[in-house]
Every structure is written in structure tokens, then in C-alpha cells.
């Protein structure tokens, strides 16, 4: 990566035994946040796929925003896990006064032969610290800047509609954990025919 586009120190923790507990804690926190996000924006889950769920009468019913919002976590979680999956988690450090990701970008693009980057549906960031100036996540079309607050979770669509950048922190380093929420691969989603 060119430093004028992105200047950070990154480590991927996914699949590394020494980071397994941290990865599990981050994924659990993000999943809790995702359930709340889906209740607020139910079409995130139901617009891409016409989902059906069994009703109390045993018949299958289309999953509507109202049905989704009424589900408790125990009902909603298996549906979400059937459709979506976590991405590889990166820890990133942006050095104060120098680091950042000033290039306007989105998270959905063709890159690898398996099309993993094209399966990205949502992005997420957990801010691991604060106490520095600027360093916001800025969304171009929404004309919005999200100020980092330690422990807060940001979830947003991965597509160009949420083109964003990471502004340079001032007066201190910025640390984040970040990844994506991806669709399951079609082979898995449609394995039953």
C-alpha cells in the first residue's frame, strides 16, 4: 500500500493461535452489535435474499422487517449465521501526525480469484483508544465524521454508497480493530438446492 493512500502498521490476528481468545471476544462483540444493527436496518439481511422462516404454524413465511425486529437473539442469531460470516480481523495503528487512510475508498471490489472481497456486505471498526485529536472515520456521501471513542463499534455498508476514509490522528496514535461481515459463499447458501 502506498503511504499517501494508507499509512498504518497492521497485523492480521485471524487464524493465529496466540490471538484466538482476542479474535473470539471481538467477533462476539461485533455479533451483538450486528444483531442491533439488523433490527435497525433489517433490509441489510432481507433485501439481498428473499429469506423465509418457519412460523408458529409450521408453515414457511417470508422474513419481513416486522418479523425480524420481533425476533429475540436466540431466534435471529441462527438466521444471521446462516447468511453472514465474519471476516479476518486486522489490528491497525495510525501514528499521530503521520498515519491515516486519507484515500476515499469502499470495501467492495474485485481482487482475488475466490472473490472474497466481493462477498463483503458490511464493514466494522472497534475504536481501541481515544484521547487524540481528529482521526475520524469520514463518510463522503453522508457528509459525516465519526469521532473515535474507545470501545465504540462502527458498522456500515461496504459498498461505494459508504465511501469513507480514516483521517489522520493528531496528538496521539489511533488504534483500531477492523474487519468485514461477509455473505456466506453461494455454494453454502444454496447447497440444499
Please place each PLM-identified region on the residue numbering.
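Fe(II)/2-oxoglutarate oxygenase catalytic core
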Residues: 1-153, 161-193
Amino acid at each position: 500500500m502506498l503511504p499517501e493512500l494508507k499509512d498504518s502498521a497492521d497485523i492480521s490476528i485471524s487464524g493465529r493461535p496466540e490471538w484466538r481468545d482476542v479474535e473470539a471476544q471481538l467477533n462476539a462483540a461485533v455479533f451483538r452489535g450486528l444483531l442491533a444493527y439488523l433490527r435497525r436496518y433489517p433490509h441489510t439481511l432481507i433485501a439481498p435474499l428473499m429469506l423465509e422462516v418457519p412460523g408458529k404454524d409450521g408453515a414457511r413465511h417470508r422474513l419481513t422487517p416486522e418479523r425480524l425486529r420481533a425476533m429475540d437473539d436466540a431466534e435471529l442469531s441462527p438466521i444471521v449465521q446462516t447468511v453472514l460470516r465474519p471476516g479476518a480481523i486486522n489490528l491497525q495503528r495510525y501514528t499521530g501526525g503521520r498515519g491515516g487512510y486519507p484515500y476515499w475508498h469502499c470495501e467492495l471490489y474485485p481482487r482475488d480469484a475466490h472473490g472474497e472481497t466481493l462477498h463483503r456486505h458490511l464493514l466494522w471498526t472497534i475504536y481501541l483508544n481515544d484521547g487524540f485529536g481528529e482521526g475520524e472515520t469520514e463518510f463522503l456521501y453522508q457528509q459525516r465524521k465519526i469521532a473515535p471513542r474507545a470501545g465504540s463499534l462502527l458498522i456500515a455498508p461496504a459498498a461505494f454508497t459508504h465511501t469513507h476514509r480514516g483521517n489522520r490522528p493528531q496528538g496521539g496514535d489511533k488504534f483500531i480493530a477492523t474487519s468485514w461481515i461477509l455473505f456466506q459463499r453461494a455454494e453454502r447458501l444454496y447447497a440444499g438446492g
